[in-house]
From Swiss-Prot:
Keyword Hydrolase appears in the UniProt entry: yes
Gene: rnhB
A GO BP entry: mismatch repair
GO CC list: cytoplasm; ribonuclease H2 complex
Broadest EC class assigned to this enzyme: hydrolase
Protein name (record): Ribonuclease HII
Chief localisation class: cytoplasm
Co-factor binding comment: Manganese or magnesium. Binds 1 divalent metal ion per monomer in the absence of substrate. May bind a second metal ion after substrate binding.
Keywords, sorted A to Z: Cytoplasm, Endonuclease, Hydrolase, Manganese, Metal-binding, Nuclease
Described function: Endonuclease that specifically degrades the RNA of RNA-DNA hybrids.
Cofactor: Mn(2+); Mg(2+)
RNase H type-2 domain location: 27-226
Length: 240
């Protein structure tokens, strides 16, 4: 594939895209990726990373975050922090996702993450779909988190950052077991939603969450009516 006269090859190794772009004076190259698109609870986290020229020697274990175990991801995260020339993260709350929609939140977050980098990139590589508005040239790379080093690095930073947030949320909402499933749809998460209804960290615009919210409201309404009915027999007015 050629882009602006630069030959970009998927089989050139994990650092191939960056080497080619830097060789043609288009660097530094920033990679952007996100974590949490498929979750129904918790934030969307977007990361942007520019790797230092010598990063290759420090990132032998770098790969798409989804291919790494949680323990190895945490270790690779520290490697990326040491090897990054610049990095940034943007955390978009569940409430903001409900307000603007997932796609808009994701696109806006990517732009903000790139804008917050301490070093201005000359080129931006994104994972999967094209994004305009970075202020510099950009290219979408299909499965970029598997074939482009800076995108893989961004995927690790986004995933580890979000996982840490979800573990922290678990201490506030232990009944949902966020530390285990990280807000994604699992049988255990669905059972917790059915049992407890959604909390403030759930994305209320999502169909499965909205359904449980409606069921919970109905159940609470029935319980309230029952309580008022019972207490009325005893001549007591209860305000709930």
């Amino acid at each position: 594939m050629r882009h602006y006269g630069v030959a970009l090859r998927r089989d050139a190794g994990l650092f191939g895209y960056e080497r080619a772009l830097n060789r043609h004076g288009l660097g530094p190259v920033a990679g952007v990726d996100e974590a949490g698109r498929g979750a129904c609870a918790g934030p969307l986290v977007i990361a942007a990373v520019i790797l230092a020229p010598e990063a290759r020697q420090r990132l032998a274990r770098l790969a798409d975050s989804k291919l790494l175990t949680e323990q190895i991801r945490e270790s690779v995260f520290e490697d990326v922090m040491a090897a990054a020339a610049a990095w940034s993260t943007v955390v978009i709350s569940a409430a903001e996702i409900d307000r603007v929609g997932l796609h808009v939140a994701n696109i806006t977050g990517m732009r903000r993450a790139v804008a917050r980098l301490s070093a201005r990139p000359g080129y931006v590589l994104t994972d999967g779909f094209a994004v305009a508005g970075f202020g510099v040239e950009s290219l979408a790379v299909v499965k970029g988190d598997r074939v482009v080093a800076c995108v893989a690095a961004a995927s690790v930073v986004a995933k580890v950052t979000r996982d840490r947030i979800m573990r922290a949320l678990h201490t506030r909402y232990a009944e949902y077991d966020f530390a285990q499933h990280k807000g994604y749809v699992t049988a255990a998460h669905a059972a917790a939603l059915a049992r407890c209804g959604p909390c403030d960290e759930h994305r209320m615009s999502y169909v499965n969450v909205a359904a449980h919210a409606a069921t919970t409201r109905e159940a609470r309404s029935l319980r309230l009516e029952d309580r008022v009915l019972v207490t009325s027999r005893h001549g007591v007015t209860e305000t709930v």
